[in-house]
Amino acid sequence: MPGDEKPVGVAVLGLGNVGSEVVRIIENSAEDLAARVGAPLVLRGIGVRRVTTDRGVPIELLTDDIEELVAREDVDIVVEVMGPVEPSRKAILGALERGKSVVTANKALLATSTGELAQAAESAHVDLYFEAAVAGAIPVIRPLTQSLAGDTVLRVAGIVNGTTNYILSAMDSTGADYASALADASALGYAEADPTADVEGYDAAAKAAILASIAFHTRVTADDVYREGITKVTPADFGSAHALGCTIKLLSICERITTDEGSQRVSARVYPALVPLSHPLAAVNGAFNAVVVEAEAAGRLMFYGQGAGGAPTASAVTGDLVMAARNRVLGSRGPRESKYAQLPVAPMGFIETRYYVSMNVADKPGVLSAVAAEFAKREVSIAEVRQEGVVDEGGRRVGARIVVVTHLATDAALSETVDALDDLDVVQGVSSVIRLEGTGL
């Protein structure tokens, strides 16, 4: 019976939205969790920055001495949900080095220091779990590390940031510009006071690094991930997207690439992209997340759900806690880091996609042929072209706008083409360059 087993001591570091929910689940579901683990889970302490009486938990559980809490002999598992890279890194390493398993949701730390943390866990023969670091409540880490362990993953792509997906969904459905949609997201609590990490793609890039590392058995850091944000997306881009039967989503894409010489590389990238309305990811709206995994034998799998928030993230954290505690009781370990492949990261210029290019041009004859010539010079094939008038607030035509959709082209060739277009006298400026994804997602 669970009650006959030695209790598993748990320390929780952080008592914000996620930490509070984790503590609530541990306390309110104690009997069920004990049955699933095979022993009671006992909360030994909660690490906070400041000990105050208004935290909703017994004050005797609170401490601001993180190092002392992690070092306690009666703590077997440390749950880290503090957030910042430091002091989280120090606390996690301290726990692992003392032989304690760790559960963390710290994507920023994992995207830069997974190797160091995994090595510390390996040396101490303990577990390091981080399901909640990517896409909140959506189970995607465990399927990649366990369910698909016998398969070859080819591609992982999806929407992994709820803030940007809410903003883009609002722009799509209401016609709002970026600033208005961001203000709405902030008012509803979907965007941080400083939204840079979300809207510039840093958050999604950290998650892409984690997913690529796991899926392809190599080591990818956030610095290896090509990144673009959503701040330059305009209502006009959505209008053109609709005309093409698409919407716009911020995608994280990780894929295995075979070069012409037959060697294997990994690509990891984050950017806004046009997605066909027929694709399942186009229907992922609001703050929801979704991840599509493609594997050789399993084919295409899709995971969908809430990607952020206290309760959804705590669900994933507590799931990891149960796994780590069960291993502790049984004297076993969970999956170890698998980095045997050591694949190089492909530079962005190597990647082939289709492109949507929008530019403001002079409203006179010969402009379209001049624009098309620059694409042809760099062997970028045009699939579709549209030209429309630009009017001022009074309805007077003041210029023209050309939208070009290409066939597959390398990023390097497209970048050269855009630079050349900007140098043309008849082009007043290239306003948008957005990739088209969908057929390979």
UniProtKB/Swiss-Prot annotation:
It catalyses: L-homoserine + NADP(+) = L-aspartate 4-semialdehyde + NADPH + H(+); L-homoserine + NAD(+) = L-aspartate 4-semialdehyde + NADH + H(+). Pathway: Amino-acid biosynthesis; L-methionine biosynthesis via de novo pathway; L-homoserine from L-aspartate: step 3/3; Amino-acid biosynthesis; L-threonine biosynthesis; L-threonine from L-aspartate: step 3/5. L-homoserine binds at E192, D203. A sodium ion is seen in the structure; a metal ion may subtly affect the relative position of the nucleotide-binding region to influence enzyme activity, and could increase the stability of the enzyme. NAD(+) binds at V18, V37, G47, G309. Was identified as a high-confidence drug target. Belongs to the homoserine dehydrogenase family. This is Homoserine dehydrogenase. It comes from Mycobacterium tuberculosis (strain ATCC 25618 / H37Rv).
